[in-house]
């Protein structure tokens, strides 16, 4: 479905799928847990899922003759780290709005992890004291205008690269890649677990797996804490992406599966259960997840497995999207592991 779209390679290639035997055993052994390691996909600033999206956006940025990538995220945004990395790789400037999305007061929160790496790569990173919202923000529009006012030519990339016209394509490619890997493995996964906030990762998966008639097996774990807004944005991106790739049919509402039980107490704030999930993944598989995104999807997968959501014998694929650098912003929380 993606043949007509130009792709600028930023990743190593197909990401590894690995079986997680010790986590499987810790969860009772009746459901096989596997992981697709999007967190290990590139040498660019520790990689992550945003690079898969940006591969389909960069050709448009280059064609526009822009000299500055402009994007937005929270203080510990993985996305803005990846935009900064791409700008450095392409020899472009980068201006970033880092909003105060998370009610978290660790003393080093705005000086370590993602934002430290972002600044190290030369991005002009500006902290704005606005709260969490996945929609289009005035602060981002102001940043775009500021580049124009200074004589630059901006290329605008929204939060998470999600509502960009090509934002869903990378994870259509993910679904096609999984199908090829399943052919090599000799089986198909029964469920795919993915974190969802700004929406295009799950939306792209839904469209890609809809072409394989199994979109409803993509289980989104909401980490936004604003489930109605997130679902609406996923729906928007699904429809746009399905039209772009000429899926040939509308995606049904029941094919968009998002569970809202794990985002508490707030976006970017881990619950005790999130922390327990982070520790279990680390101590059984040395797989590092973060308290904002992957810790919550890990929590969701663990809880669903324990309460019998997945039938006995199921093979579950956990999409590890990255995000470990944010752990540095929670140094007090994890000071003892």
From Swiss-Prot:
Gene Ontology molecular-function annotations: 1-aminocyclopropane-1-carboxylate deaminase activity; D-cysteine desulfhydrase activity; pyridoxal phosphate binding
- Give the GO terms filed under biological process for this record: 1-aminocyclopropane-1-carboxylate metabolic process; amine catabolic process
**A Pfam family per the record:** PALP
Cofactors required? pyridoxal 5'-phosphate
Asked if the record carries the keyword Hydrolase, the reply is yes
Tell me the first and last residues of the signal peptide.
none
| EC number(s) on file | 3.5.99.7
Q: Which HAMAP family match?
A: ACC_deaminase
Q: What is this protein called?
A: 1-aminocyclopropane-1-carboxylate deaminase
């Amino acid at each position: 479905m993606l043949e007509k779209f130009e792709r600028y390679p930023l990743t190593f290639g197909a990401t590894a799928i690995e079986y997680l035997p010790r986590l499987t055993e810790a969860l009772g052994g009746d459901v096989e847990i596997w992981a697709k390691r999007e967190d290990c996909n590139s040498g660019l600033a520790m990689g992550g899922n945003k690079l898969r999206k940006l591969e389909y956006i960069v050709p448009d940025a280059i064609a526009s003759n822009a000299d500055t990538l402009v994007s937005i995220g929270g203080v510990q945004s993985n996305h803005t780290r990846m935009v900064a990395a791409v700008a450095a790789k392409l020899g472009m400037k980068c201006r970033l709005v880092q909003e105060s999305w998370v009610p978290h007061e660790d003393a080093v929160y705005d000086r370590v992890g993602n934002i430290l790496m972002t600044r190290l790569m030369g991005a002009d990173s500006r902290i704005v004291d606005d709260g969490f919202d996945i929609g289009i923000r005035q602060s981002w529009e102001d940043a775009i205008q500021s580049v124009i006012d200074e004589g630059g030519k901006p290329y605008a990339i929204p939060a998470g690269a999600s509502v960009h016209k090509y934002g869903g394509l990378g994870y259509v490619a993910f679904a096609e890649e999984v199908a090829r890997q399943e052919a090599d493995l000799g089986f198909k996964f029964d469920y795919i677990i993915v974190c969802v906030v700004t929406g295009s990762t799950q939306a792209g998966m839904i469209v890609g797996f809809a072409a394989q008639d199994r979109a409803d097996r993509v289980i989104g774990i909401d980490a936004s804490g604003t489930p109605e807004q997130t679902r609406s944005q996923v729906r928007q991106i699904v429809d746009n992406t399905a039209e772009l790739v000429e899926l040939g049919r509308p995606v049904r509402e029941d094919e968009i599966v998002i569970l809202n039980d794990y985002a508490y107490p707030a976006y970017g704030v881990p619950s005790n259960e999130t922390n327990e999930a982070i520790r279990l993944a680390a101590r059984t598989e040395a797989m590092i997840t973060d308290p904002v995104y992957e810790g919550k999807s890990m929590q969701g997968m663990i809880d669903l497995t324990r309460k019998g959501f997945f039938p006995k014998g199921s093979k579950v694929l956990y999409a590890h999207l990255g995000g470990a650098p944010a752990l540095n912003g929670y140094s007090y929380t994890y000071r003892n592991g």
